[in-house]
Amino acid sequence: MSEHYIEFRGVSKAFDEHVVLDDVSFFVNHGETVVIMGRSGVGKSVALKHIMGFLKPDSGRVIVAGEDITDWNESQLAEIRRKVTMVFQSGALFDSLTVGENIAFPLQTREGITGEQIDARVAELAEMLEVADVLDKVPSEISTGTKRAVAIARALAQDPEAILYDEPTTMVDPLMAAHTSDLILKLKETLHKTSIVVTHDTHLGKKLADRLVFLHEGKVAFFGPWLEFESSQESFLRNFRLQDELIPALDVTT
């Protein structure tokens, strides 16, 4: 079995002649958390959509769970999407369902699972993600940060091998962003799942990254350990770090 769970091999993607990904190569090992960073519009979320099979590259190969999924059809991709789940920036919750029903939704079509087992799994995840007190509420009755936690719980419902987070701390206040990052860190340390986190937040990146992919003008400008990123003197990397150093990180544990 390959050490790499996810791998990009020279992936390129353009939209209307605008190149978003340009010969991008990186890998994520089993159980590792890789953070993808870069300024807005450099293709961070586009990379995640390739892993899920929502987009296909113009060139290059995408490997997931030891399989080259580049040319797979929707039926084949359904198998990968049971192994890899994605937490969208919007949360993508069902407005008409309660929080508990949203978390349970991926399990409803699973064969061989009873209602009692579904209820137990929902309770377990609600406790883990600290949303047990809102299980009977609908999404419109909870905060954006709580919606993110519910979306993460739903993504974990089927016990996937890997989870992709798309900007998990955006559009929330700093305190909730810090709380969300602490929840993701707790999951990293307890579940040890293969993970990719897309973010522009260096505080979150430093907290979570085993290694970092930094995209610049559609290319991989840096791929390696966080400490090497922090010490790099490349001007665009240094400038990116400096912009976040102006915003103090919050520690909700103190």
Question: Which stretches of residues belong to each language-model region?
Answer:
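Conserved catalytic motifs of ABC-family nucleotide-binding domains
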Residues: 159
